[in-house]
From Swiss-Prot:
GO terms for molecular function: isomerase activity. GO terms for biological process: toluene catabolic process. Belongs to the 4-oxalocrotonate tautomerase family. This is 2-hydroxymuconate tautomerase. Keywords: Aromatic hydrocarbons catabolism, Isomerase, Plasmid. Pathway: Xenobiotic degradation; toluene degradation. The active site is at 2 (proton acceptor). Catalyzes the ketonization of 2-hydroxymuconate stereoselectively to yield 2-oxo-3-hexenedioate. It catalyses: (2Z,4E)-2-hydroxyhexa-2,4-dienedioate = (3E)-2-oxohex-3-enedioate.
Length: 63
């Protein structure tokens, strides 16, 4: 069972996360020749101040 664990900065809509899940699942199923119904996708949303970019919190880097 292929599993993808994705970490994203909070703030995406439910629709965007649904699209992400669908597209990642399809890509994994196609590239691994796995049944789509066996693919799992886990999304962990991170607060901007818990995510670093270039040594700085994303809350300071991304506005």
């Amino acid at each position: 069972m292929p599993i993808a664990q994705l970490y994203i900065i909070e703030g995406r809509t439910d629709e965007q996360k649904e699209t992400l899940i669908r597209q990642v699942s399809e890509a994994m199923a196609n590239s691994l020749d796995a049944p789509l119904e066996r693919v799992r996708v886990l999304i962990t949303e991170m607060p901007k101040n818990h995510f670093g970019i270039g040594g700085e919190p994303a809350s300071k880097v991304r506005r």
